Amino acid sequence: MQYKEVAGGICAPKGFAAAGVHCGIRANHSEKYDLALIKADVRCAAAGVYTTNKVCGAPIKVDRAHLTDGYAQAIVVNSGNANTCAANGVALAEECCELVGKALNIDAKDVLPSSTGVIGQPMVIDPFARGIPAAAAKLAADAQGSTDAATAIMTTDTHKKEYAIQFELGGKICTVGAIGKGSGMIAPNMATMLAFYTTDAAVSPALLEKALKTVVPGTYNQMSVDLDTSTNDTLIIMASGLAGNPEITEENADYDAFVAALTAI
């Protein structure tokens, strides 16, 4: 199967915009971007794969609850605080989803939160109350939007990570884009790694989840740096279906091609 590298990262597929802003989440008062927002024009088939650690971050608990129907429309990510082992963690993650829902005029249950950073630190809603509306106002469906979001999810990373490819499904050009973070503490089985995929391919929620779970063991779970498994490992994909290919609803040649494209990313 042939692929073409394209610019734009998570904003390369049709129907997606992204942003990154600084809102003051880090305890050291760093001016770095620390909040990313990814928004789809339509409700998307969505799936996630998470840490195997018995202790998981509050956002993962919320993600699992929000993904029971297999759909989502936005992802909100903060860096600098893991929102793990905090008494109010789940409530705060849900409140972040409410803020995103209000800012984007979508259902809060269609928002998937994610966090990375220091474990066990207090976390308050104030930075999110400032940052989420700012990120919503800054959303851009272009390469800069993807780059800003990729920058905002970094912690100890020395380089941002984003990529996108195009391929053909059912006679239509489809695109998959991704951003990720992970530098130190990314082992075994992903550990402190976040990755967010967008695609305009039409894939049913069930087959999207199956494809993601097929790809992860031979790709992300092979990474090893310092033998720690994080509480916050997260890989989420949203599929807008706007490429116009026949929806993948069974394991056929198009499904195999889609899995191959995810593996290539």
Q: Which role fits each region the language model picked out?
A:
Residues 1-91, 95, 101-265:
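A structural signal for small-residue-enriched, beta-sheet-centric alpha/beta enzyme cores
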